[in-house]
Design a protein with these regions (language model features):
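HIT superfamily nucleotide-processing domains
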Residues: 1-140
Length: 140
């Protein structure tokens, strides 16, 4: 199999978007990293240890990520989940989410996946989970 399909990925890591918060993060601010992404604390956490998984290449839309980047992000989600659960035994669930486009709540035009630790009693009734982005549709 040729690696030519991955050449733009490697070349893209040298290109950063001026003014992009996620393109200028210093590696000493990383919680963890792999070849294609890094984990960072959320600046405005929903819960304690809320993390962001961010591709190193500047990509605005999640659906424009390569399969390699998606796989690397998934591996990082697992690594961070394990780290959080080992650090905090009160964590017994997670929400994972991506906002794609301003209309969906994307506030920074660089892909980032939220990993939000959940604890018993952190909300009165968690039924519906991420469906709560449309409050009238959360309960079913």
């Amino acid at each position: 199999m040729s690696d030519s399909g991955f050449r733009p990925i490697a070349e893209g890591y040298d290109d950063r978007q001026d003014g992009c918060l996620f393109c200028v993060v210093r590696s000493n601010e990383f919680l963890d990293e792999n070849a294609f992404c890094y984990a960072s604390k959320d600046a405005h956490p929903v819960t304690h240890q809320h993390a962001l998984i961010i591709p190193k290449r500047h990509v605005v839309d999640y659906f424009d990520l390569t399969e390699l980047e998606v796989a690397a992000i998934h591996q990082m989600l697992i690594a961070m989940r394990n780290r959080i659960k080992n650090d905090d035994l009160t964590v017994n669930g997670f929400n994972i989410g991506v906002n794609v486009g301003k209309i969906a709540g994307q506030s920074i035009p660089h892909v980032h996946v939220h990993l939000i630790p959940r604890r018993q009693g952190d909300v009165e009734n968690p039924q519906g989970g991420v469906r709560g982005v449309i409050p009238d549709k959360q309960k079913y």
